[in-house]
Amino acid sequence: QAEVRTVLLDCDLRRPSLARMLGIDGGMNLGACLRGDQEFAATARRIGPNLALAANREPALDAGEVFGGRYLPLALAAVDETFAPDVMIFDTPPMLLTHDLMSFAGHVDCVLLVAGAEMTTVKEIDLCERELATQTNVMGVVLNKCQHIGDGYGYDAYE
């Protein structure tokens, strides 16, 4: 939707990848912004008429402390004031590998849980969904990296 102002934040500070994937160079340092050391406007880059990206080019050694820190709510408020986005999307690290998301989840309106097919069990998805629901609203679950398509899928199944 072209009219929707969106801010995409690469909150996987341990293994940031969005700036690199999108071919954006420069001194992006979302960790410094979330620590209160840098203004959000100096961190973010517009990559379209209604899309801004904030990321880290290099891993942050203190990622756990950043998300549990006192500046996080202030930094998120600054994002809202600076860009007035309709939607903010936070790409976070895998929930089962770090506690970053649980420290962060209470500061967002909702989450969309993304699970890797053949990597994440139903039991793990259920556990993550229940834990997230204690902090915020869970919109749903997306199954990612799915390679198998069953016989009953597609238009041929209607014949």
What do these predicted regions represent?
Residues 2-4, 108-110, 135-139:
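Short glycine-/polar-rich loops that comprise or flank the Walker A/P-loop
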Residues 4-84, 94-98, 102-106:
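P-loop/Walker-type NTP enzyme "switch/lid" segment
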Residues 9, 55-56, 86-92, 113-117, ...:
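Conserved beta-strand segments of the P-loop GTPase G domain that flank and frequently precede/overlap
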Residues 16-18, 62-64, 122-123, 148-153:
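Switch/connector loops and helix/strand junctions flanking conserved nucleotide-binding motifs
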Residues 20, 78, 123-131:
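Short alpha-helix adjacent to the SAM-binding motif of class I
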Residues 86, 94-97, 108-126:
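Conserved Switch II/interswitch segment of TRAFAC-class P-loop GTPases
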Residues 126-159:
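Hydrophobic micro-sites
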